[in-house]
């Protein structure tokens, strides 16, 4: 049985839950022994402890710092792109290769169908997303979700294919960054990302980008130019990770918490700055506490957004996308 991953700020809650579980076991044993007084006493203690657990759970997860949200976004049990695809969509057909160099397993994509009988909605989409692994072997296979140039070129090939068949594009963003290796630079990492930004801006089909976990720098925005940008409540999106920011500014990773605060990288921060359009609420404690509920929420919002975007003509889609990104940022003009 896999060991449960407990983050540092979750330890007090985990310890209390362990104590609660032990008491429930004792209650079960006590009930079997027909010890009525002991059973009643344990039941009362359990009720009190359950209230404490609920109160502590809300106190922790409703008051997360920016750094704690970064930690949740990186949680190894969090649902990844393929999890969302199989929970939200049907008939997924993965397409491989960039037709130039090779196939990148850190960035996957293909046609799939989103169906929602309650809303009378059915639509084939091109879904593209970063894919991480859950253990050492799969992480090496997926390169820890860090895409190579061939991954971004594959993504662009699939987007152009979607445009050819007039199908919307849905991207799922979850990466610690584009792969920074020498080989990636030799193969044109910067050019591949820049080309995607240019081409995505002009796609004549609806494009929806969903930040489901980590959204680091060019690795994220390489598939992140959309008409609508949705962001999970405990995801992060920034030009740099808190650790890298800390190492540049303070020559040490020790100041990552301060860096996270300064970067303003949470969904709330980015909604306020009008960089993202909607925040996707997560189950209390993070998406990994109820992946199916999280996938249902994402699917519901995708259906809502797709229905609206599919009514727009291609020229409006392109113009709105360009205007959206041109309006981002804050600057001053001196006379």
UniProtKB/Swiss-Prot annotation:
Q: Which GO terms describe its biological process?
A: fatty acid biosynthetic process; malonyl-CoA biosynthetic process
Top-tier EC class? transferase
- A single cellular component GO annotation: acetyl-CoA carboxylase complex
The EC number on file is 2.1.3.15
Q: Which reaction does it catalyse?
A: N(6)-carboxybiotinyl-L-lysyl-[protein] + acetyl-CoA = N(6)-biotinyl-L-lysyl-[protein] + malonyl-CoA
InterPro entries assigned to the protein according to its UniProt record, in alphabetical order = Acetyl_CoA_COase_a_su, ClpP/crotonase-like_dom_sf, COA_CT_C
Q: Which HAMAP family match?
A: AcetylCoA_CT_alpha (MF_00823)
What job does the chain carry out?
Answer: Component of the acetyl coenzyme A carboxylase (ACC) complex. First, biotin carboxylase catalyzes the carboxylation of biotin on its carrier protein (BCCP) and then the CO(2) group is transferred by the carboxyltransferase to acetyl-CoA to form malonyl-CoA.
Protein name (Swiss-Prot/TrEMBL)? Acetyl-coenzyme A carboxylase carboxyl transferase subunit alpha
The taxonomic lineage of its organism, from the top, reads: Bacteria, Pseudomonadati, Chlorobiota, Chlorobiia, Chlorobiales
* Originating gene: accA
